[in-house]
Amino acid sequence: MKLEKRHFLNYSILIPYLLLSILGLIIVYSTTSALAIQKGVSPFGMIKSQGIFFVLSLVTILFIYKVKLNNLKKKAFIGIVIIAETILLLLSRFITDTVNGAHGWLSFGGFSIQPAEYLKIILVWYLALVFSKKQEEIQQYDYQALTHNQWIPRDLADWRWMVLFLIAIVVIMPDLGNATILALTTLIMISASGIAYRWFSSLLAILVGGSTVLLYSIKLIGVERFSKIPVFGYVAKRFSAFYNPFNDLSDSGHQLANSYYAMSNGGWFGLGLGNSIEKQGYLPEAHTDFVFSIVIEELGFVGASLILALFCVLFLWGYGQEIHLIR
């Protein structure tokens, strides 16, 4: 019996997504409106652009829902997408100006996009396509089906070279935050490919151990020496702020320290939506990476925990769906 398309809609994933998106729009307006009014510009400017991206996300969801799965499995299709993404990444690195010390943004008629964000989706799509075609080999040969007993692949068309190439472009932005997320995404996709879980545990242990050694090495070597390494000079100050943001309140630690102040102001129940103190100019770029500190300041620990709970629901239902499909 042929199932109707609506049977494939998972409302347990869709509803938390919609709620989080609407909450995000409210928070963006709350975070940006006051400062916009002070500057004499429209308080709705940021929420309009974010609203457009929200609508585009719904259009994308509808497109993926309507498109035939076989089309997504075509090598030519994903190949064209990867080529287009590579061009966007290279343009954002070598043609555009820096934003807060790093490249990575492209502007089109008043809108800015960050190609590295789209790479996260493309990477999942690409690895899912590669691993889905190796399922019989994985069942028979485990992880060897992915590596062919070559830790350094000899074939330039090997999927590992493609992943390393794409992540390397992000690293030279430099954008180590997104590069780390892409590396973790690759690790998760490998673990979900069907290989024995002991290999995932080993990879995770190596990753955690390597990250710990790297952080302590940077601390021992010193941030100044680390900053002389090509590409990584940009992140040197961030490591310094990570260790103690209050040592340099006027420069590298300013944003992080003020995010701590914002969270401290919030307490259990917050100052109330729209009543943040730090967003009045004390916390730079409050609507970007540090927006959650404003959420805690306005909604408190309880409100922020409810939002995190929605993220957990979204993750758990998504992971449950993955397990169901594997079985």
Predicted feature descriptions by range:
Residues L18, K39-D251, S293-R327:
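Hydrophobic alpha-helical transmembrane segments of multi-pass inner membrane proteins, especially
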Residues A34-Q38:
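Juxtamembrane/transmembrane-helix boundary motifs at the membrane-water interface
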Residues K5-H7, W151, D155-L156, Q280-L283:
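Helix-boundary and loop/linker segments of multi-pass membrane transporters
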Residues K237-S240, H254-Y260, A286-D289:
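Short hydrophobic, aromatic-rich alpha-helical segments embedded in or entering the lipid bilayer
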Residues L19-S33:
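Alpha-helical transmembrane segments of multi-pass membrane proteins
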Residues M1-Y17, D155:
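N-terminal membrane topogenic signal
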Residues M1-L3, V28, K134:
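A juxtamembrane structural motif centered on a specific transmembrane helix
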Residues Y260-V302, Y319-E322:
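Long extracytoplasmic/lumenal interhelical loops at the membrane interface
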